């Protein structure tokens, strides 16, 4: 994520990843304030056996796109709501990538963080049967939680 303030949203992705049993790491990496940290991180992602990157950022939100430019791993971008433009600035920064630098862009805020974790788990489930089983259980539980009739 781009800053400490993004954690109030991105911790929701952690919760889902924990429930589904996807190993993860959480770091603060700002594309603007810590560019060397960003380059160094991107350089070791494959070596460190990372399969998917979830990058949450607010404002100009260049982190997901820059990480995508520096690695061939799937990058999922979560726009974080900003005070001035309600996250529209973040969304447009992440979704409007030039051809050849893909970022899977999710919804602004909490729903985006949760769906990014589920999407990352879906990607990992293509080669990890434990994650696949846990993800299927999570989805089944979610389906069962929906009432058939209103109270």
Q: Which role fits each region the language model picked out?
A:
Residues 26-47:
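N-terminal beta-loop-helix "entrance" segment that forms/cooperates
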Residues 41-79, 83:
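Glycine-rich phosphate-binding loop
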Residues 109-143:
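A charged, well-structured terminal subsegment
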Residues 70-107, 132-138:
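Short, acidic/small-residue loops that bind anionic groups at enzyme active sites
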Residues 1-33:
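Glycine-rich phosphate/diphosphate-binding loop of Rossmann-like nucleotide-binding domains
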Residues 6-11, 35-38, 57-66, 85-88, ...:
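Short glycine/serine/threonine-rich phosphate/pyrophosphate-binding segments
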Residues 142-151:
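Accessory alpha-helical/coil subdomains and C-terminal extensions
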């Amino acid at each position: 994520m781009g800053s400490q303030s993004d954690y109030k949203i991105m911790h929701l992705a952690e919760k889902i990843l924990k429930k589904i049993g996807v190993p993860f790491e959480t770091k603060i990496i700002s594309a603007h304030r810590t560019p060397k940290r960003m380059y160094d991180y991107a350089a070791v992602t494959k070596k460190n056996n990372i399969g998917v990157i979830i990058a949450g950022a607010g404002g100009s939100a260049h982190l997901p796109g820059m990480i995508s430019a520096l690695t061939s791993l799937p990058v999922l971008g979560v726009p974080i709501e900003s005070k001035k433009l309600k996250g529209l600035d973040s969304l447009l920064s992440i979704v409007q990538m030039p051809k050849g630098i893909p970022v899977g862009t999710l919804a602004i805020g909490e729903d985006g963080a949760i769906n990014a974790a589920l999407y990352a788990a879906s990607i990992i489930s293509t080669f990890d049967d434990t994650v696949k089983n846990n993800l299927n259980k999570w989805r089944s539980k979610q389906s069962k939680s929906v009432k058939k009739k209103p109270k």
